[in-house]
Amino acid sequence: MYCVQCEQTMVTPKGNGCSFSQGMCGKTAETSDLQDLLIATLHSLSAWALKAREHNIIIHEADAFAPRAFFATLTNVNFDSARIAGYAQQALIYRNQLIKAVNEVEPNPNIDHPLANIELNGISVEQLALQAKQFALDTDRQQIGEEAHGVRLLCLYGLKGAAAYMEHAYVLDKFDNDIYAEYHGFMSWLGTQPGDLNELLEKALAIGSMNFKVMAMLDAGETEHFGNPVPAMVNVRPVKGKCILISGHDLKDLKELLEQTEGKGINVYTHGEMLPAHGYPELKKYKHLVGNFGSGWQNQQKEFARFPGAIVMTSNCLIDPNVGDYADRIFTRNIVGWPGVTHLEDHDFSPVIEKALQCDGFPYTELEHLITVGFGRKTLIDASDAVIDLVKAGKLSHVFVIGGCDGDKEERHYYTDLAYALPKDTAVLTLGCGKYRFNKLDFGTIDGGLPRLLDAGQCNDTYSAIMLAVTLSQKLGIGLNELPLSIVLSWFEQKAIIVLLTLLALGVKNVYSGPSKPAFLNDNVMALLHEKFGLSGLTTPEQDFGHIINKNL
């Protein structure tokens, strides 16, 4: 096992990365190794998808499968070795379909790729786990050096994040052949184990550029299906009655669940990154979508244990449900998996509803605590003139974008301290589950109108923040980096990595990121990123605030 993709990975004087029988996330060495094997088969699939495109051959199912299976290797998504092995087998089935299709127009085709003809050494998990060891991601680390190896992983993990967003968009009927061709290009290239540092840095930015198009596609899918988000009040306290909790990112699953539970006397609560659902007109119209429960994903073992109903995980982040003894009432969907947990293959939520009716539910209604969500792209852009007026009037001095992933490191209290310590003439635009560090605090308003805390949505809704910045830049006639706007990113896993690469690709400079640096990037690479892009780590809220304000004077 060698896994170094998330913040909680092992960091020791002897080296970084989880490399024992189990990772810090709870993933076994077997599952981790099988994920490496799956990635190798996906490299092969992408190599042949590119070859097929030379003959205008596209197998839609193969294109859709590739990023979906890659998504399964993200942190806290799928811990089920059997399903990971199944994805690897399916990858080669699609790969072979592509080879057959190419062979019909180009007899005996061949491509120059080290994984072009990879085959699996068996069908059992045990056989494949033995084979998987040769595809560990650190096999040539010493040969190419820590810097190049780290930036290669930056590309791989960034592409994982983009793959996740591609899958989120796909379930909302958004699919672009050109974007998938780009994805296959990057995935195939990574399978050649590139080692040139300059090329790797260029590709990292190119992956970020591709992801901007992916986020636009996802934004279109969400707004076309559910309407443009509007500001809405959300109760974060329990309501008496039977209940279901839904977590993850898949708003389509939530819509299906709401339709199937309507009139059954079951209250539905959002959790984690599902919170923004309360701002979408086609979701908030359901009266039994009563509120949001819990906080960041890292607290789920305690919070799910005391939630008296059924739970649905539609995407990341999942952690061991056996710790809180709720494995019998949690269900996984899509690419999520945990051994022994019931997996729903389609949108039939009957087992979830049945389990919810068996559970006790909340015995009484607690005193309401309301927070506001729904500041999506259209709402933010519509408010851009008002924002400019406040800036010109000297009533709004700076906008801080504080968002990204949450996690359990004590250092993450930095984000709470920073947000709450900001002057009253500043606003905080937040997104991702990092918002749970401060979204239940009262920030008040600016000039009696604009809320100081603006919840833009899920981590992929960085697109909304970017489009606001672009709009302000155009209306003020200044560059993006001249705006009184700063980004303080909270990273934990691969979606945050691709968000960062997207910002850098767009030319956004002086981003602050923390609470710690990724373990796969050494000090030399971090210094290089600081030199090229102004990327900085965190110090203290007071010191970083001072640096930010001084740069904008």
Swiss-Prot record:
One of its GO terms (biological process) is response to hydrogen peroxide. Binds 1 [2Fe-2S] cluster. Hybrid [4Fe-2O-2S] cluster binds at residues 249, 273, 317, 405, 433, 459, 493, 495. Coiled coil: none annotated. Its EC number is 1.7.99.1. The modification Cysteine persulfide is found at residue 405. It is an enzyme of class 1 (oxidoreductase). Keywords: 2Fe-2S, Cytoplasm, Iron, Iron-sulfur, Metal-binding, Oxidoreductase. Its main location: cytoplasm. SUPFAM superfamilies: Prismane protein-like (SSF56821). Its cofactor is [2Fe-2S] cluster; hybrid [4Fe-2O-2S] cluster. It catalyses: A + NH4(+) + H2O = hydroxylamine + AH2 + H(+). GO terms for molecular function: 2 iron, 2 sulfur cluster binding; hydroxylamine reductase activity; metal ion binding; peroxidase activity. [2Fe-2S] cluster binds at residues 3, 6, 18, 25. The keyword Endoplasmic reticulum does not apply. It is found in: Cytoplasm. Pfam families: Prismane (PF03063). HAMAP family: Hydroxylam_reduct. Belongs to the HCP family. Catalyzes the reduction of hydroxylamine to form NH(3) and H(2)O. This is Hydroxylamine reductase.
